[in-house]
Amino acid sequence: MSFNFLKDNNKKVHFIGIGGISMSGLAEILLNSGYRVSGSDRSESDLTKHLQAKGAEIYIGHNGNNLKDVDLVVYTAAIPDSNPELVKARECNIQTMDRAEFLGHVMQGHKYNIAISGTHGKTTTTSMFSHISLSANLDPTILVGGNLDVINGNVRVGNSEYFVTEACEYKASFLKFYPYIGVILNIEADHLDFYKDINDIQNTFLKFAKLIPNDGFLIVNADDKRCVEVSKQVDCNVITFGINNGDVRAKNIVFNNGRPTFDVYRNEEKLFTLTLNVPGNHNILDALASISSALSLNVPVDSIIEGLSTFNGAHRRFEIKGKVDGITVVDDYAHHPTEIKAALNAAKNFPHKRVFCVFQPHTYSRTISLFDDFANSFSNADTLVLADIYAAREKDTGVVSSTMLGDKIRENGVNCKNLHSFEDIVTFLKGELKDGDLLITIGAGDVYRVGEMFLEAK
């Protein structure tokens, strides 16, 4: 199926799992381009309601009868072959395509595809670059893995040759993309339910980098040795960034109330001084990646400064949820040991008396494969509360639990408590937190509800 938006928008596309953050964005891109769209999901959500209001046919629950006059069925990697809609589509010889391949087709309609990859920081960097591209009036189409205030959601449909998207390495999805600019923020062990080991992961990132045409750009973190190794094996232009190394660097970094100010240098030339509204060294690196990408497109420095100066953070990325009785409540999507350390480092740089952390591990496979790394991630928390593991797509086989992780963390000298329900966690926090303390909820599941419940309870 060819996706020439000017010629083929009489087609009807059905999305299985249309309520997901990426699938809903793709559906909205098609709706804005005049396609007929239908889709199903297990439950109603704000995203499904939004799409319905834009004209999509939404079905709650998966049923083969939901496929009505459909030309193409798009599904996510999480959808099993036994899904009744996928079964029906194949029985009826309706073309099917997974989300990544479909996104690749959409990207082919644009000349300048900016695909942002890495184990951590994809959503924040995509959001930062989106701010820059809007300030520069590039009129981009944007697809981001979280809600971004400046576009009032997770998708923006532009009318230019610029397409900005996250590029996820899970199940090697990003190998179906067509990047003109490919960003690799970092390469670490994750998704070990799919990859054999870290070398397998690095080789997959190399394959992604080799998708970039010779006149395109690979933007890589010079402070990450695996990124550097990848950059030495490509034929396209390479721009490196970093705090300690790189073509584009941050120097003279100072923190004020958690917010970093630094000078941006390209080689030995000072370009400008920048203050970010988001805390932590990891956000400096994400900003440098965005700046490097913008410089490769010859975006004016003034637009770069304006874009990053108006960026106040992506949702669920060190997001300040509120303040009550002098207690600041923050939420962060971190679900990998490196991300957790970065979030807690940002918390330490934020004005506080004590840092209370509530962590909900995400998936059994990730918890067991990175068990020791998780256990060593919480030294910057004065008190840690562990919630039960968020299963997501997995089943509990009894191999690992939050209690087991808590025992290991306590061996490392961290004040750690295991509690099983959010209600019990909130009750504990109400009795412990005092004026000047900072509460940070961490995890990719629904642990953000703890912060919301605490604010409501107070």
Swiss-Prot record:
Residues forming coiled coils: none
EC number: 6.3.2.8
GO cellular-component term (any): cytoplasm
Subcellular location, record wording: Cytoplasm
Entry's Gene Ontology BP terms: cell division; cell wall organization; peptidoglycan biosynthetic process; regulation of cell shape
Reactions listed under catalytic activity: UDP-N-acetyl-alpha-D-muramate + L-alanine + ATP = UDP-N-acetyl-alpha-D-muramoyl-L-alanine + ADP + phosphate + H(+)
Catalytic class of the enzyme: ligase
One Pfam family, short name: Mur_ligase_M
Molecular function GO terms recorded: ATP binding; UDP-N-acetylmuramate-L-alanine ligase activity
Record: residues binding ATP: G118, T119, H120, G121, K122, T123, T124
Keyword field: ATP-binding, Cell cycle, Cell division, Cell shape, Cell wall biogenesis/degradation, Cytoplasm, Ligase, Nucleotide-binding, Peptidoglycan synthesis
Top-level taxon of the source organism: Bacteria
Pathway field: Cell wall biogenesis; peptidoglycan biosynthesis
Function: Cell wall formation.
PANTHER family linked: UDP-N-ACETYLMURAMATE--L-ALANINE LIGASE, UDP-N-ACETYLMURAMATE--L-ALANINE LIGASE-RELATED
Family designation: Belongs to the MurCDEF family.
Protein name (record): UDP-N-acetylmuramate--L-alanine ligase
Source species of the chain: Clostridium novyi (strain NT)
Gene: murC
